[in-house]
Amino acid sequence: MPTEEHQTYRELPMLPLRGVLVFPYTVIHLDVGRKKSINAIEDAMLGSKEIFLATQKEAQTDEPDEEDIYEVGTVAEIRQILKMPGGTMRVLVEGLFRAEINAYLANDPYMKVRVEELRDKKIKSPELEALMRNLVGQFEQYVRMSKKIPPETVVSVVAIEEGGRLADVIASHLNLRINEKQRILELSDINKRLNYLCELLAKEMEVLELERKINIRVRKQMEKTQKEYYLREQIKAIQKELGEKDERSSEVEEFRERIKKANMPKDAEEKAFKELERLEKMPPMVAEAVVVRNYLDWILSLPWSLETRDRLDLKAAEAILDEDHYGLEKPKERILEYLAIRKLAKKMKGPILCLVGPPGVGKTSLGKSVGRSLGRKFIRMSLGGIRDEAEIRGHRRTYVGSMPGRILQGMKTAGSKNPVFLLDEIDKMTMDFRGDPASALLEVLDPEQNYIFSDHYLEIPFDLSKVMFITTANSVFNIPRPLLDRMEIIEITGYTEEDKVHIATDYLVPKQIKEHGLKESNITFSEGTLRRIIREYTREAGVRNLERQIASICRKVARQVVEDKDTFVHVASNSLNRFLGAGRYRYGVAESENQVGVATGLAWTESGGDILSIEVALLKGKGNLTLTGKLGEVMKESAQAALTYVRSKADELGINDEIRDKYDVHIHIPEGAIPKDGPSAGITLATALASAMSGLPVRSDVAMTGEITLRGRILPIGGVKEKILAAHRAGIAKVLLPVENKKDLAEIPAPVKRKIKLVLVSHMDEVLEETLLKLEAIQPGEDFPGVLLNPELVGENLNQDRVEPEANKDLC
């Protein structure tokens, strides 16, 4: 609002200011760089050299609008312009008087406004005089406290007689926020302006007083530190004269005694003494002294010569292994062999074993049992997800917070140089720009190198040759070949159903009853119940999920016992739905009838073996092949090879030309959501194709596995034990295997061998002889589900002579 009787307006270019406010009666430099601002300056220079200065509400706004600018500003006169590099300019302006925006007249090429002058009234009163004196006194005290304002400024301020001008000049010298300065600019009442400025000045002096006290306190602390350092040096000199030892000397002497008693190798001892000499020469407060002290602590905490005595009693060790784990004969046998050799040969390098098997078969817990059976310390290190090489070898001491790798950290924890060291999930490591931890493990797991294992932090060799390293993995395919070559692979296959029943009865059920606070008198499981849990509620090679299901039943029984509903519960097979709900898995069983175009194969998965039905249908077409069931590339190629073989043997199989050339073949493997791959279904595919194209049914009690070539040769496959166990579980009477897999039959449990007839075959002709039913065996009017026999085709088959290959079977 104007303070004069007549309102005075001016039309002026406007310069929006960012982060700065110009008061009347002040001279200030402004750096101008925005295009519109430069245009406003240039236009003002062409006229009266007056320009309106208004501050933006937000300094970050590059292109301010009307609502982004405070309405009250200062009319200033341009005194000087200096053009700077980059198209900017430095402008010297002098504030003249307050003004308020009345209207915006233009926005381009610069902002032009009509402003209303707000000149101060020239009045005098006792109250105004008192306020001015108080403000001047406060300002003088502020100048003395801040020491940032020249004393000459006080002289010029004291000479000001107008209250409004006094407030503006003093406000321009204070370090205030923009909103506080803007309020001073907007206060047209001089008394209110002086009062508000006195309040702000009082707050600023309080802040300065606090800063002064803080500075004094910091200075005293620094003086105290320097004084303490000086006194310590004096104490050292006095103690030296008296022949006494100071704290640093005592620490150094303690380290020296520990190094002598550590019984370290010569090179490690020399390194330790060298670092101790460095520590002795360093001032106590130097940061490097802490690094050296930590380094010496690490060296002295490692078990350079400490060993635990092995328990060489083979019977006791075997009893411990059998107590903790059922089955697992191969790894147990290998551990006992190691004990026997240790008993005969005192000096022997520790073995490096790799236990490979599906989840839940007891690989990790077996490592702990090995440590217990040998009487050694046990250390476990999980490698899953590790991608930094420094996790194995440590960080160099040049890095802040460096420390040894997890190998030496484990050795420190063990406190002996011959622990059982379990490297869990070695197939789950990854690599990135920080290095490859698998490559770093080569030195750890190589018996020819690990006796001089060098950690980046220690930089001295440490002997790992007496450590018994055991690694675990679910698959060897993800382990780098050089690393795999350094380990002794022991495969732990899945448990049979009989094994799982035995483990559940003797281990899992008693364990869960105890963990849930129950007693054997509260709950019992029948054998049929355990079998149904295994078949319908779990699908795994191990027993982890089986234990989980048993625990679920125990929880429900525990609740019943607490609620006094039942004090004894017998978990019967027919009551499982009440405890666990409906079965989750389809239990694979053999086909009940002989069918045309349907053959039973065997599959090997991470959860063990399973049976695999293969279905073939013929459709009129052009001889094309269609494959469904989410098959992998290898399996698709096996199907193509099987079809080629069957077509090449069309005459011998009694397949007429029309069926061979004018019918499309559709091969489907059920459970289409599950990916399937591998070459071992080759002979099963060929059998199903031969059956569909010849019209001869396939025996439903026969399962088979093997890779086929175009000439009909049968190549060996993997997972023999798991596949035969799956066939036994499904009720298969006969299994056909490649003759080259005869060596794998030694792993098959004797009870399974007695119940299944194992036939070794080397050529596809032998497979067809064992699987396809001769047409003479078909009873008149008998029908085979799945594919209807073509009467004409049957007639042709009956009239053709079949080539019967000589039997070349190896029965087991």
From Swiss-Prot:
InterPro entries: AAA+_ATPase, ATPase_AAA_core, Lon_bac, Lon_bac/euk-typ, Lon_lid, Lon_proteolytic, Lon_Prtase, Lon_prtase_N. One of its GO terms (biological process) is protein quality control for misfolded or incompletely synthesized proteins. The keyword Protease applies. ATP binds at G357, P358, P359, G360, V361, G362, K363, T364. Belongs to the peptidase S16 family. This is Lon protease. PANTHER family: ATP DEPENDENT LON PROTEASE FAMILY MEMBER. Induction: By heat shock. It is found in: Cytoplasm. One of its GO terms (molecular function) is sequence-specific DNA binding. Keywords: ATP-binding, Cytoplasm, Hydrolase, Nucleotide-binding, Protease, Serine protease, Stress response. The active site is at S680, K723. It catalyses: Hydrolysis of proteins in presence of ATP. Its EC number is 3.4.21.53. It holds the Pfam family AAA. It is an enzyme of class 3 (hydrolase). Homohexamer. Organized in a ring with a central cavity. Residues 12-205 form the Lon N-terminal domain.
